[in-house]
């Protein structure tokens, strides 16, 4: 509701397939009455496109299914065949042509970040032009969201300075996490380990997830930062390291090319990149500070002699990621959602 207050259009990207996961994209759409636009790869089908669309639209009664968008069509004729195959009354949001020049490059954790693609505006303009020329349906009626006031959060971190790594290596940061820290009263100080920045004067540190393995040479060379973090932890100050942040705290990191780099050494062990996905999904962790919800998504595996403080759990009760703790250092593959428990977050950084 807060995002809708100052936006004309909200586009919510689902994860995996429409009905996959707990909760699924369909669950979220049904819960909040959000119209669903199915993006269907039409590259290897024609009339079957309509059958797939029909299945998605009718699989769950009550789903607010608004229509479809065809991806990777080979020609205008191909797009017309896909459109003509749709059941009567189903919305057609257009078609995107099979165009290698417009494809956004990706890596193991998804698309490259926008700042890494020099001609991203040109690519997006090309895709927008294709949609403008092929769409024949208006946007659905606006969704009315309940006006939910923001939660009242006590300023438990008032006067506390939290240093946050933020650059090409550490960029997986939920905006809601920053909002929660600010609501708790924390002063946020950002720095770039890749650029060689020193650790700012601070009371706590957050090393979020990202791609440290892609910037291993620069990070390995920033020994002054690792020394400062060791001194920070030795002084009894809090440090939260998530996923790529945790990888950086091990003694070594082996990248996808098989090259091993020396890293911080705050945690014994090594983190090794894998070719296959190691973990994906929602998890929660019952820490001494309280329960925190989160998400895990990584292609690396870590080997350490450390015993976990606790293990996170998946939504269906299975054992999840290890949560390590040494003094005030907390490390895990889980990307925590601070808004799920602001008091626990304050205790982690306080």
Go through each PLM region and give its residues.
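Structural motif
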Residues: 11-13, 37-39, 41-42, 69, 71-74, 163, 165-169, 334, ...
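C-terminal and late-domain segments of enzyme folds
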Residues: 156-158, 170-180, 184-188, 272-276, ...
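Internal gly/pro-rich beta-alpha loop/helix module
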Residues: 46-154
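Short, solvent-exposed amphipathic alpha-helical segments in soluble enzyme
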Residues: 26-27, 53-55, 83-87, 177-183, ...
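Cysteine-nucleophile active-site neighborhood
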Residues: 212-286
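Phosphate-binding active sites in nucleotide-utilizing proteins
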Residues: 160-234
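ATP-dependent carboxylate-amine ligase catalytic core
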Residues: 1-32, 40-63, 76-80
């Amino acid at each position: 509701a807060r995002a809708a207050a100052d936006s004309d259009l909200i586009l919510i990207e689902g994860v995996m397939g429409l009905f996959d996961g707990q909760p699924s994209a369909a669950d979220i759409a049904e819960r909040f009455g959000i119209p669903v636009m199915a993006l269907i790869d039409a590259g290897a089908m024609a009339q079957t496109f309509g059958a797939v669309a029909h299945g998605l639209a009718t699989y769950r009664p009550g789903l607010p299914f608004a229509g479809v968008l065809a991806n990777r069509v080979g020609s205008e004729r191909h797009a017309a065949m896909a459109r003509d195959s749709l059941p009567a009354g189903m919305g057609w949001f257009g078609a995107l042509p099979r165009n290698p020049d417009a494809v956004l490059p990706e890596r193991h954790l998804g698309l490259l970040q926008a700042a890494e693609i020099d001609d991203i505006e040109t690519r997006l303009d090309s895709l927008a032009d294709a949609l403008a020329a092929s769409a024949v349906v208006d946007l659905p009626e606006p969704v009315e969201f309940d006006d939910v006031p923001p939660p009242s959060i006590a300023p438990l971190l008032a006067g506390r300075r939290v240093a946050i790594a933020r650059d090409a290596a550490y960029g997986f940061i939920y905006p809601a996490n920053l909002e929660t820290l600010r609501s708790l009263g924390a002063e946020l100080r950002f720095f770039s380990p890749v650029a060689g920045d020193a650790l700012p004067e601070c009371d706590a540190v957050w090393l979020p997830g990202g791609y440290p393995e892609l910037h291993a040479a620069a990070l390995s060379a920033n020994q002054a930062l690792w020394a400062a973090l060791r001194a920070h932890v030795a002084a009894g100050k809090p440090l939260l390291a998530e996923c790529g942040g945790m990888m950086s705290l091990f003694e070594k990191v082996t990248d996808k090319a098989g090259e091993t780099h020396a890293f911080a050494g705050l945690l014994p062990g090594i983190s090794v990149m894998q070719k296959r996905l190691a973990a994906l999904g929602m998890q929660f962790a019952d820490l001494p500070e309280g329960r925190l919800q989160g998400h895990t998504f990584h292609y690396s595996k870590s080997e350490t002699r450390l015993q976990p403080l606790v293990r996170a759990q998946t939504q269906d009760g299975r054992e999840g990621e290890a949560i390590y703790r040494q003094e005030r250092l907390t490390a895990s593959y889980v990307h925590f959602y601070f808004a799920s428990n602001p008091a626990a977050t304050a205790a982690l950084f306080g």
